[in-house]
Amino acid sequence: MSEIVVEGGRKLIGEVPISGSKNAALPILAAAVMIDEPVVLDNVPELKDVFTMLTILQRIGKKVSFRDNRVVVEPGNVLMGDVPYELVRMMRASFNVLGPLTMVCGWAKVGKPGGCNIGQRPVDFHIEGLKALGFLIKEEHGDVIAKKPSSFKEELYYKLPFPSVGATEQLMTVAALMSESKTIIENVAREPEIQDLQNFLNKAGAKIKGAGTDRIEIEGVEKLHGIEYHIIPDRIEAGTYLLAGVSTRGRVKVSNVIPEHLEALLKVLDELGVSITCDKNSIEVSVSGELKPIRVSTAPYPGFPTDLQPMLTAVLCTVPGESIIEEKVFENRFGYVDEMNRMSANIKVMNRVAHIVGVEKLSGAQIYAPDIRATAGMLIAALSAEGQTVIKNAAHIFRGYEKLKEKFTTIGAQIEVYPEE
């Protein structure tokens, strides 16, 4: 079992360059399935989930190379429509190849995916949306089998029951290549990663508008062509390092970022009493006075991101008074609370609402990590705690953070990473 050992109680001071966004890179790689020319992507983070997606592309027939954060995807053998379950089970984003592969092969079979256990994240939104666009879908033995219809309707409309990021990406991608159709999708996700996917597809020849709003319009085209594209920076990684700086009452600057993507976090930090300095592509936070308790609700973008909720909880553990976080996206996102309470935190969760009473200091302990973002939250708590913390089952975090030890060490953290034996 992998573990991270942290010697806490040190102020973090310095600058962290932020990597490319995994959550932007993965759907773009899935979309590359539909492009029969070379696709070159820069600023791709070297993470386990990215390697998993590249392996999927190789297994279905693409040629792939990955070096120095640059991915090249080229045509290879005849594409296969069957994606091995041993790859799909490793992450949810693998399901995004279902639609693109069906568009190219005429059919595809993809297992229902795995990933972090943070609550219900059914692929039903994907399936119902694809059906609404005309795809024939059946489920058997844990697999989803999709078949492309002989033709699509000229005008298609679908309203998502929930602004699912994955379903928005899936439907927008396949509709881009439905040349006989104009498609309107409403109640879509508005995340920056959706906008990045639209920008990628449009540069490749698609005709899409509306990403960043709750309505996307797609005029299908016959073919997408190969391009070079630069992936946006990872706003969740940036937020993690900023919150680590606040938690240790230090001064941390993140560079290579888009501050507009972090407006919800910056608003919360301002309410906390954090000093914030922004320029075109960097953000710096520092703490000089006493922080104030706050109330926050998570929400789909542009609201406060659920992926930063565990890290914010870690910060609030040592803020005087009672803070409240209401989790409105995933019902099991507070699965880390019992472990954080082992570090002398005072957190009570009732009906998806966490009541956090600040303590003077946290104390190091041995704790067990359940998922990527919970591990990051525990790491931030450990950095501010007195003494040593051992985070067990820590491999999750390397699915979401590139060069984690190197970056934290650069700003003064004392951590050791022990991989699985």
UniProtKB/Swiss-Prot annotation:
SUPFAM superfamilies: EPT/RTPC-like. The active site is at residue 116. InterPro entries: Enolpyruvate_Tfrase_dom, Enolpyruvate_Tfrase_sf, MurA_subfamily, RNA3'P_cycl/enolpyr_Trfase_a/b, UDP_GlcNAc_COvinyl_MurA. It catalyses: phosphoenolpyruvate + UDP-N-acetyl-alpha-D-glucosamine = UDP-N-acetyl-3-O-(1-carboxyvinyl)-alpha-D-glucosamine + phosphate. Its EC number is 2.5.1.7. Phosphoenolpyruvate binds at residues 22-23. It comes from the Bacteria. GO terms for molecular function: UDP-N-acetylglucosamine 1-carboxyvinyltransferase activity. It is found in: Cytoplasm. Pfam families: EPSP_synthase. Belongs to the EPSP synthase family. MurA subfamily. PANTHER family: UDP-N-ACETYLGLUCOSAMINE 1-CARBOXYVINYLTRANSFERASE. Cell wall formation. Adds enolpyruvyl to UDP-N-acetylglucosamine. This is UDP-N-acetylglucosamine 1-carboxyvinyltransferase. It comes from Kosmotoga olearia (strain ATCC BAA-1733 / DSM 21960 / TBF 19.5.1). The lineage of its organism: Bacteria, Thermotogati, Thermotogota, Thermotogae, Kosmotogales.
